[in-house]
Amino acid sequence: MKADELRKLDDQQLRAKLKECYEELFNLRFQQVMGKLTATGRPRVVRRDIARIKTILRERELGIEVQETGR
């Protein structure tokens, strides 16, 4: 998920999304250990989504305003 899409969500929705990502990462790791993981790049994507969500939550905590790039 892109950062712009995540910034449109409120804190409660972001925390729910963060929980979903952690659960997905857990399941992906479990599949990897069992040898059933077919989408080998997915754990990396989920970890990056977690980092994006945590960054946005921290920005809001500190009151940092992010400029939109306009791309």
Curated annotation (Swiss-Prot):
Keywords: Ribonucleoprotein, Ribosomal protein
InterPro entries linked: Ribosomal_protein_uL29, Ribosomal_uL29, Ribosomal_uL29_sf
MF (Gene Ontology): structural constituent of ribosome
Disulfide bonds listed in the record: none
Coiled-coil residue spans: none
A Pfam short name: Ribosomal_L29
GO biological process: translation
GO cellular component: cytosolic large ribosomal subunit
Gene3D superfamilies: 1.10.287.310
Ribosomal protein listed as a keyword: yes
This protein's record includes keyword Transport: no
PANTHER family listed in its UniProt record: 60S RIBOSOMAL PROTEIN L35/50S RIBOSOMAL PROTEIN L29 (PTHR10916), LARGE RIBOSOMAL SUBUNIT PROTEIN UL29C (PTHR10916:SF0)
Homology family: Belongs to the universal ribosomal protein uL29 family.
Protein name: Large ribosomal subunit protein uL29
Organism: Roseiflexus sp. (strain RS-1)
Taxon lineage: Bacteria, Bacillati, Chloroflexota, Chloroflexia, Chloroflexales
Encoding gene per record: rpmC
